[in-house]
Amino acid sequence: MTADDVLSYVVCEPAFGGMVMVVNPVVLEIIRGSLRSTIQEMELLMERCAMSPFIKEKKDYFVGIYDRRSRIVCCHISSSGPGMVSPILEAYALEDMCPGDVYWFNDPYICKGAVQHHQDMVFAIPVFDAGKVVAFTVTYGHYQDIGGMKAGSISPHAS
């Protein structure tokens, strides 16, 4: 089996049949291009709608698509990522999630360092197909001021 053959096989999760499928390389490239395009659109939307100069100008944010088991499918940078969805899955069952749910947290400890400090806000939205969660779209961004002793949420006098 060559490297090209490996790229031509996709193993589906047991919940979706657990079968191995042969994937046409052209179809694979179309899917890859669609995922990249989706990530680029997420980036543009994040920058365009941001109120925080850290997001808008410094580009201190992350966008990505995860599967239902918290594995990265596609993202715009690789320095962040693992740990963004796992805290949500530990707190909420997939079966209890509903269309329209948005999950939000900013705790760097529960996400195993995927975000670095409390000003990084993570938002995750489950994606549904036929009533089942199949993926998550995830963003995080650095917000300048989330409250605290001093403007900017960072005070040298805090203990």
Regions found by a protein language model. Name each.
Residues 44, 49-52, 71, 75-78, ...:
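Conserved mixed alpha/beta core segments that line enzyme active sites in large multi-domain catalysts
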Residues 128-159:
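Mobile "lid/hinge" segments at catalytic clefts and subdomain interfaces of large enzymes
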Residues 10, 20-82, 87:
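Long, charge-dense accessory insertions within large macromolecular proteins
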Residues 2-19:
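Intrinsic disorder/low-complexity segments
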Residues 62-65, 104, 124-126, 135-138:
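Structured core elements
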Residues 58, 97-98, 132:
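A generic structural signal for short, non-catalytic loop/turn and secondary-structure boundary residues
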